[in-house]
Amino acid sequence: MLALFNKLLDWFKALFWKEEMELTLVGLQYSGKTTFVNVIASGQFNEDMIPTVGFNMRKITKGNVTIKLWDIGGQPRFRSMWERYCRGVSAIVYMVDAADQDKIEASKNELHNLLDKAQLQGIPVLVLGNKRDIPGALDEKELIERMNLSAIQDREICCYSISCKEKDNIDITLQWLIQHSKSRRS
């Protein structure tokens, strides 16, 4: 009975209260950041993506939550911009190409360098290991170990293994993001 009441209350709140959140999506080039944005916005996977030059901003509405998503280029010349776009956001989404093991060390270093910035302290981080559909891609446990995520103690950190191409775990990723739009307001 209580569950039914809570669902009814959530439905009622959704009619009158809209939630907004701001996210920044960063990670090395070719990890699938822009593809991820397109998949959550339209449900469509496009094989022919052009690397982001600088940044893109997109607003996506899911239920009563509007997500303002900053997609920042991952090439070395754009990485100095990451901190600026991560300040004050609801969460940082860090994309990793889980199938490109040669870049895992560089990806780990960039993530830890970013999170060492004082102005980003306490902002939750969602690490997404993309391209799990490719044989040999790291799973969540391997990503946590290779990215040294257990060393990050000053904030909430979560890691999912996803495939934008197959839309694997996109639903739980969205649930995590929406949950964090609610937790930032309270």
Swiss-Prot record:
PROSITE patterns according to UniProt: ARF
UniProt cross-references to SUPFAM superfamilies, sorted A to Z: P-loop containing nucleoside triphosphate hydrolases
GO MF term (any one): GTPase activity
UniProt-listed Gene3D superfamilies: P-loop containing nucleotide triphosphate hydrolases
An individual GO BP term: protein transport
Intramembrane segments: 1-19
Subcellular location: Late endosome membrane; Lysosome membrane
Cellular component GO terms held in the UniProt record: late endosome membrane; lysosomal membrane
CDD domains in the record: Arl10_like (cd04159)
Keywords recorded for this protein, A-Z: Cell cycle, Cell division, Chromosome partition, Endosome, GTP-binding, Lysosome, Membrane, Mitosis, Nucleotide-binding
Pfam families the record matches: Arf
Main location: membrane
Residue numbers binding GTP: 29-35, 71-75, 130-133
NCBIfam families: small_GTP (TIGR00231)
PANTHER family with a match to the protein in the record: ADP-RIBOSYLATION FACTOR-LIKE PROTEIN 8 (PTHR45732), ADP-RIBOSYLATION FACTOR-LIKE PROTEIN 8A (PTHR45732:SF4)
Purpose of the protein: May play a role in lysosomes motility. Alternatively, may play a role in chromosome segregation.
Family from the record: Belongs to the small GTPase superfamily. Arf family.
Stated name of the protein: ADP-ribosylation factor-like protein 8A
Gene this protein is translated from: arl8a
